[in-house]
Design a protein with these regions (language model features):
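Long, low-complexity intrinsically disordered regions in eukaryotic nuclear regulators
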Residues: 1-7
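Contiguous, amphipathic alpha-helical segments that mediate oligomerization or scaffolding
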Residues: 7, 14, 173-176
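Eukaryote-biased feature marking scaffold/signaling PDZ-domain proteins and nuclear chromatin regulators
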Residues: 11, 15, 54-56, 100-102, ...
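Beta-strand/beta-sandwich contexts
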Residues: 13, 19-55, 62-64, 178-209, ...
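Beta-strand-enriched, solvent-exposed domains that form extended recognition/catalytic surfaces
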Residues: 22-176, 414-416
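Eukaryotic intrinsically disordered, low-complexity regulatory regions
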Residues: 180, 184-321, 326-328
């Protein structure tokens, strides 16, 4: 194989096997996850202050490894004035400090601008970054940007820099809308994850689900899956959706919250701009594009639209806005719609980095950390290609505790040789003797002992012997 030119130096498996088995026995004790949610598209603004507009990126830390990391750092840090030392010196955290991680965060863009997330991040609590990203580059033709999240303990340890995927940059949407099909990837499809915002000169509010109640909030938001559904579909616990179809104005859609799985009633999505809401659009004619404004009309009452109560500035209730009666005729619009009836549609993406340090905190940053996206077996299942981002030559693949021959191709791809049946049998016996259930899980191990688990499993394929035909 050509990739053998970049074969990764094999890690001493005996040296790491016991530590790896300790991790496999209880991964939740060691895993540290970094969840980064951000918009897939940013909007370019041309004015005196050139900038990119996007909804708030969100950061959530999870996993028991963060508390373990904190205890290790607190015991090893020589600075008594460190924030970690100012916490309780008891080895057992009380209820108030149980979710504290003391990790500070900064968000950066590709042009180097840095803004600080105000408070230390706590477990399972999203920390929000800034809304506006200044782009001082003279090149107004920029097509994409990146977000870089830096996590660190003040004065103690630098966790690393975690990078988003590429964020498309689009110009401010024009009033006119192109007839389908659109040549770029800026159209919404059924099954996409989106956020919905109401923006005006005074405030920006986001559609949010909190404790089962639909509300508007700032800066927090909820993500929704937008589904294409049939107009005659009955509401129920299970809905029949049309996946991967392009969403066009005039179609019937259903919004389902991704966290609490709460769905709004069926609504018709309509074009909206400063001139009003278009009531005459036929489905299949105009695609719904990123960063365009839309209105959602309830099917049960054509005079009822999804909106927000405008009386509260920061936190508002979800309240359908009732218009005076109208007749839906060709070319008719609702003139001067209330601003809280029109929504800015922004595509959203969430990525999760996971790492573990069973041997204690690494001497340096845990990044670049691999982000696993897909895998593909080839050569009759003997090899597998793992695709993603953040791969380095320092990483070697393991299947449970079996070291795999690993070939580094580039930062987005590595190739691994899967173990033989004999190697699997020896590993299964070894793990079961240690009281560990084999999972055939693929993970990457850095040469200093940092583990990056994937969600990919490669169980042994059962071989069915063919019966001789008579």
């Amino acid at each position: 194989m050509e990739v053998k030119k970049n074969a990764v130096k094999r890690i001493n498996s005996d040296q790491f096997r016991l530590k790896l088995q300790g991790y496999l026995a209880d991964p939740s004790k060691y895993n540290c996850s970094v969840t980064l949610g951000y918009p897939r598209t940013a909007q370019k603004s041309y004015g005196r202050e050139r900038r990119l507009l996007m909804c708030y990126p969100a950061v959530v830390l999870g996993g028991g490894g963060w508390r373990r990391r904190l205890e290790i750092l607190r015991n090893s840090c020589p600075d008594d004035q460190c924030r970690i030392h100012r916490l309780t010196h008891n080895s057992v955290f009380d209820a108030e400090n149980q979710k504290k991680t003391c990790v500070s965060a900064e968000m950066m863009t590709t042009n180097g601008e840095v803004w600080r997330i105000p408070e230390a991040i706590s477990l399972e609590v999203p920390a929000m970054a800034q809304l506006r990203i200044n782009d001082m580059s003279d090149d107004v033709s920029v097509k994409s940007t990146l977000l870089k999240l830096r996590l660190f303990y003040q004065g103690c340890d630098d966790v690393g820099v975690f990078t988003s995927k590429s964020i498309s940059v689009v110009s401010k949407p024009h009033r006119s809308v192109s007839v389908t099909p659109v040549s770029n990837n800026l159209s919404f499809k059924s099954g996409d994850i989106i956020t919905l915002s109401v923006r005006s000169t005074k405030m920006t509010r986001n559609l949010c689900v909190n404790g089962g109640v639909i509300c508007g909030d700032l800066p927090y938001y909820s993500t929704f899956t937008i589904h294409l559904v049939d107009e005659n579909m009955e509401e129920g616990t299970q809905i029949k959706v049309r996946e991967n179809e392009t969403i066009t104005y005039g179609s019937v859609v259903k919004l389902v919250d991704t966290e609490e799985n709460i769905g709004l009633p069926k609504m018709r999505i309509l074009r909206a701009d400063e001139r009003g809401i278009d009531l005459s659009t036929e489905p299949g004619l105009y695609e719904v594009l990123h960063f365009q404004r839309a209105a959602f009309q309830f099917l049960d009452d054509p005079n009822l639209f999804l909106g927000l109560d405008d009386k509260d500035y920061q936190t508002v209730r979800a309240k359908p806005c009732i218009q005076s009666g109208f007749l839906s005729k060709t070319g008719q619009r609702i003139i001067e719609p209330i601003p809280t009836e029109t929504w800015l549609l922004i595509p959203h993406e969430t990525i999760v980095y996971t790492f573990a340090e069973p041997d204690g905190c690494a001497d340096g940053p845990v990044t670049p950390a691999p982000l696993f996206e897909s895998c593909m077996e080839f050569a009759k299942g003997e090899y597998v290609t793992v695709n993603g981002m953040g791969f380095t030559p320092r990483l070697q693949a393991f299947l449970d505790d079996i070291p795999l021959d690993t070939y580094y191709k580039n930062s987005e791809s590595v190739v691994c040789r899967l173990p033989t049946d004999e190697e699997r049998e020896v590993s299964v016996a070894r793990l079961r003797a240690a009281g560990i259930q084999p999972k055939s899980q693929l993970c990457l191990l850095r040469d200093d002992g940092v583990i990056y688990p994937s969600t990919f499993n490669f169980p042994r394929k059962s071989i069915v012997k063919e019966e001789p035909s008579c």
